[in-house]
C-alpha cells in the first residue's frame, strides 16, 4: 500500500521555515550552476553566430586565428579565381580580402586599456554578413580613413562614438557609423577599408579571405584544390566552424570552473537538505510507527521520504532557474583566449540548461534525502510508538 502523495506535500508545508531555508540553499547552488551554463551558451552562440555555413574562410596554414594569419595578395587572387566563389546580382564576386589587427583602446567607464579587433573589409564584406546592419550613421567610404564600430564597442570604449576620432596605425580615423551584428562577435569589432588598414599598419598581406560558396556542399572540392596547390600555403574552413573553434578554450575554462564551484557549493546544500530530512524523521518517529502499524510497508515509508526530498530539491531547482533567467538581460565582456581581444556577449538560457539544472537539483535532493529515508524505513514499529 502506497502512502498518498498529498501526505508528502503536506509534510513540506508543515515546516515552512525549514523548507524555505533548505530550498533557498539549493536554489542558490542551482543559480550558480545555471548561470555558468548560460555564460558558456552565450559565448558559444556569439562565436557560432559570427560565422555562416555558406561562407568559406581562407587563412595561412597553421594559423589558429586571423590575427596570426597572413595571405599574400597573389594567393588571395588565386582564391578569387576559384569557380566555387558565388556571384552577386551584379556579377561581382562575393568575396572579401580582409586584414585583422589588434589595437588597445581605453574603456569609457574605467579608462583602462583593452584589446580591440580592427577588421579591414573589402567592398563585399557587409554583403557576406547579413546579420550585420548599420543602425546609426553611414558606411565608411572606401579609400578613406573612416571606420564603423560595433554596437558593443561604441558603448564601451572612449572615442568610438559617431563623429569621434580614434588614433591608431599612425593615423586619425573618424567613426562615421555604428552597426549591430545581432548576437555575433562582430559587435566587438571596428571595421574599415582593408587596403587603407594594410597601408596604415605597414603590412604587405591580408589576414584572411572570405567568400560565399556557390553551393554550401561544395566546400570539400575547393578545400582540396586550394590546400594541394603548390603556390599556396593556405588552409580553408567553413566560416561557422572556424569561429566555433575560437570558443573552445574559453568555453572549456568556464565549464570546468563552473562545475567545480557547483560541486563545492552543492556539498553544503546537500548536507543542509540531509540535516532537514534527518530532523523530519526525528520529529515524526511516532507518526512513522503509526503508519507501519496501519499496514504501510518499509518500502512505502522509504519512497515517501525520498519523494519529499525530491520535491524539496525540485522546489529549489525551480527557484534557482527563475533567478538565473534574470541574467538574460545582463551583458558581459571578457578576453577571448584565442585572439586576446575583448569579446562582449550575453547570458543565454536554453531549454537544455533548464532541464540540466532541474536534474542537478533533483540529484542534490535525492543525495540529501537518501540516508534519512533509509533510517525512517528501518525504524521498528514498537520503538517508534514508544517515542510518542
Model-derived regions: residue spans:
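Short, membrane-interfacial amphipathic segments enriched in basic
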Residues: 1-6
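Hydrophobic alpha-helical transmembrane segments of multi-pass inner-membrane transport and secretion
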Residues: 16-43, 251-287, 310-319, 363-367
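Hydrophobic, regular-secondary-structure patches
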Residues: 30-117, 136-138, 143, 199, ...
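Mechanotransmission and gating elements of multispan inner-membrane complexes involved in transport
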Residues: 50, 86-87, 106-113, 139, ...
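Short beta-strand boundary microenvironments
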Residues: 114-156
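Transmembrane alpha-helical interface segments in multi-pass membrane proteins
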Residues: 278, 286-332, 356-364, 368, ...
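Short juxtamembrane loops and helix-capping segments at transmembrane helix boundaries
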Residues: 328-355
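Short cytosolic juxtamembrane segments of multi-pass membrane proteins
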Residues: 374-388
Amino acid at each position: 500500500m502506497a502512502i498518498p502523495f498529498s501526505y508528502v506535500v503536506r509534510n513540506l508545508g508543515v515546516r515552512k521555515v525549514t523548507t524555505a531555508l533548505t530550498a533557498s540553499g539549493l536554489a542558490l547552488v542551482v543559480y550558480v550552476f545555471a548561470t555558468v551554463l548560460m555564460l558558456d551558451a552565450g559565448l558559444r552562440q556569439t562565436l557560432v553566430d559570427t560565422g555562416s555555413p555558406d561562407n568559406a574562410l581562407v587563412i595561412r596554414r597553421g594559423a589558429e586565428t586571423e590575427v596570426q594569419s597572413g595571405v599574400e595578395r597573389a594567393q588571395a587572387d588565386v582564391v578569387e579565381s576559384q569557380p566555387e566563389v558565388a556571384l552577386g546580382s551584379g556579377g561581382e564576386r562575393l568575396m572579401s580580402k580582409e586584414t585583422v589587427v589588434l589595437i588597445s583602446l581605453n574603456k569609457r567607464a574605467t579608462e583602462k586599456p583593452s584589446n580591440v579587433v580592427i577588421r579591414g573589409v573589402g567592398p563585399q564584406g557587409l554583403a557576406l554578413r547579413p546579420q550585420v546592419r548599420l543602425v546609426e550613421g553611414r558606411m565608411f567610404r572606401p579609400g578613406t580613413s573612416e571606420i564603423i564600430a560595433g554596437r558593443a564597442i561604441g558603448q564601451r570604449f572612449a572615442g568610438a562614438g559617431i563623429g569621434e576620432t580614434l588614433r591608431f596605425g599612425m593615423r586619425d580615423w573618424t567613426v562615421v557609423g555604428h552597426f549591430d551584428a545581432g548576437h555575433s562577435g562582430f559587435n566587438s569589432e571596428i571595421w574599415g577599408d582593408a587596403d587603407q588598414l594594410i597601408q596604415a599598419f605597414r603590412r604587405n598581406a591580408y589576414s584572411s579571405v572570405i567568400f560565399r560558396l556557390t553551393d554550401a556542399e561544395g566546400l570539400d572540392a575547393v578545400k582540396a584544390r586550394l590546400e594541394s596547390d603548390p603556390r599556396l600555403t593556405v588552409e580553408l574552413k567553413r566560416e561557422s566552424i572556424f569561429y566555433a573553434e575560437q570558443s573552445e578554450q574559453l568555453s572549456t575554462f568556464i565549464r570546468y570552473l563552473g562545475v567545480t564551484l557547483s560541486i563545492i557549493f552543492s556539498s553544503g546544500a546537500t548536507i543542509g537538505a540531509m540535516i532537514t530530512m534527518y530532523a523530519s524523521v526525528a520529529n515524526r518517529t511516532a507518526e512513522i510507527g503509526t503508519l507501519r502499524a496501519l499496514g504501510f510497508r518499509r518500502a512505502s515509508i522509504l519512497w515517501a521520504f525520498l519523494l519529499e526530498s525530491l520535491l524539496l530539491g525540485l522546489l529549489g531547482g525551480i527557484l534557482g532557474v527563475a533567478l538565473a533567467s534574470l541574467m538574460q538581460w545582463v551583458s558581459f565582456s571578457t578576453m577571448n583566449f584565442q585572439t586576446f581581444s575583448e569579446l562582449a556577449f550575453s547570458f543565454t538560457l536554453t531549454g537544455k540548461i533548464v532541464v540540466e539544472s532541474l536534474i542537478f537539483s533533483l540529484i542534490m535532493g535525492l543525495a540529501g534525502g537518501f540516508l534519512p529515508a533509509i533510517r525512517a524505513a528501518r525504524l521498528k514499529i514498537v520503538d517508534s510508538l514508544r517515542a510518542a
